[in-house]
Amino acid sequence: MDNTFNISVILPLHSSKIRDFDEFFNKAITSITTQKVLPKEVVIVHTDEESLVGYLNSFNFENLNVKKVLYKGEPNYSSQINLGVKEASSEWISFFEFDDEYSQIWFNNVKKYSEIYPDVESFLPIVIDVNDKSVFAGFTNEATFAANFAQEMGLLTNDMLHNYQNFQTAGMAIKKKVIEDFGGFKSSIKLTFVYEFLLRMTYNSVKMMTIPKLGYKHINMRPDSLFWDYKFGPDKISEQEVKFWVSTAKKEYFFTDDRNIKYTESV
């Protein structure tokens, strides 16, 4: 029995100097090595930070096929993910974060569901959100099964996204060809780049399905994380700017390319 699936895990890293990095990273990688079905490869897109490079070179990835890709330039989550997708050699892609964890059955479920539903081009996990102390904070992606949102149970649609925004791409499986055809994350869009991506995929008739099982654990608002900085850090975003980026996502998903959007005061 083949215990691998034709999927590349894309893991962007910008620094090993983040608080509790070693603990988070070990748990994240362990959540991959203990999968019932292993991914074909893990693509780590990292900066040239000396301590990070040294850490990765000495880390024991056990049974994983790891490809390390150097990202040159200012660290940027969207751009690093996009580079990882470009360098990936698999049919499927999964976006991962160093402080998150896959459930042990996730890739096994994706493999099974992809065989049962060959027309589906992306599978979303039910995400359990926790804080940095592992205290439960809620679920994400479960709304595709809500009768007041879902037109067809389990499927994410463009109309649904216009009515409800709480969906995320962390842990998802999506065909590489879909990203090649309709574009990756847009690095110029702050805060709502995930929302814009999902709007764009569904607008282009990409069939996206949530697998009704817990598939991913996500640390929500970890101190010093990207979205924590948007709310509390030096890059704090005002309520007016939040409205701007939500409005921008709803306008930009018609375009495949990143049009280098800049924040302006009026919406």
Label each PLM-derived region with a short phrase.
Residues 71-88:
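Glycine-rich, basic loop-to-helix element that forms the pyrophosphate-binding segment
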Residues 105-142:
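Conserved donor NDP-sugar-binding/catalytic core segment of glycosyltransferases
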Residues 39-49, 69-71:
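Short beta-strand/loop segment that forms part of the nucleotide-sugar
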